[in-house]
């Protein structure tokens, strides 16, 4: 009769040790993979939101100075809002104590009625040197950096008198409007996102603007993203 052979205690301990080490390595790999996946998901979330934001701003800026041809309109009010004889319809500035070029103000004919504003009577938007179009605030736009957040101009709040004359109408595009309290609202959720840079730079001959945008997640400041976009201004003269 042959004697039975089995594992020695040392061999058993070695096997158990190797198994435990393997399980530990698998657990560490799984945890690391989960962490990397979470980082990737959060990075993509930030990237998607900032890309959506810069595309939104760019889409608005492409329309700067647009005015539709309205054959029924006797006289429009664009000249009351334009900053010079070239028809300049945009200002780049900054709020007090904010980074340079972090505020942009502009207008365009959103509803394509030929005027800045929605309603007018007798087929004219002016009465002498005064504006008579209503709801002009709906076609006066703006974006700015305020602290760690992008703000957009509230188009339902009137910061310019509806019966404005040229100087008052043009105040919608002056630096003081970048400071106006109560006329701006957050564009993003401040609990989720923080913006570190919003900048608007003129391109050569004023025929375009480069937007620079950078930010991070509020809860994960190490997850960052930056992007830029060049926007042609097709409705502005040189």
PLM regions and their residue ranges:
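N-terminal pilin/flagellin-like segments and related low-complexity appendage regions
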Residues: 41, 59-187
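Aliphatic-rich helix starts adjacent to a transmembrane/signal segment
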Residues: 3-68
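Acidic surface patches and DE-rich sequence motifs
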Residues: 3, 84, 217
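Generic cytosolic/nucleocytoplasmic N-terminal low-complexity/intrinsically disordered segments
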Residues: 1-4, 143
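Short linear sequence signals and composition-biased patches located at protein termini or domain-edge surfaces
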Residues: 163-238
């Amino acid at each position: 009769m042959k004697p039975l052979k089995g594992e020695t205690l040392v061999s058993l301990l070695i096997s158990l040790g190797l198994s435990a080490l393997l399980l530990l390595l698998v657990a560490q790999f799984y945890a690391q993979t989960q962490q990397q996946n979470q980082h990737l998901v959060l990075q993509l979330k930030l990237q998607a939101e900032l890309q959506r934001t810069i595309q939104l701003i760019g889409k608005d800026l492409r329309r700067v100075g647009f005015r539709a041809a309205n054959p029924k309109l006797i006289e429009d009010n664009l000249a009351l809002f334009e900053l010079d004889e070239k028809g300049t319809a945009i200002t780049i500035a900054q709020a007090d104590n904010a980074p340079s070029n972090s505020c942009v103000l502009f207008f365009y004919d959103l509803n394509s009625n030929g005027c800045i504003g929605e309603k007018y009577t007798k087929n004219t938007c002016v009465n002498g040197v005064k504006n008579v179009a209503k709801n002009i605030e709906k076609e006066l736009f703006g974006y700015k950096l305020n602290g760690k957040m992008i703000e957009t101009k509230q188009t339902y709040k009137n910061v310019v008198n509806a019966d404005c004359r040229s100087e008052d109408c043009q105040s919608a595009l002056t630096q003081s409007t970048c400071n106006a309290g109560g006329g701006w609202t957050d564009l993003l959720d401040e609990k989720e996102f923080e913006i570190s840079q919003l900048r608007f730079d003129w391109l050569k001959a004023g025929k375009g603007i480069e937007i620079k945008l950078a930010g991070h997640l509020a809860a994960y400041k190490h997850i960052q993203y930056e992007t830029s976009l060049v926007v042609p201004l097709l409705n502005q003269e040189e």
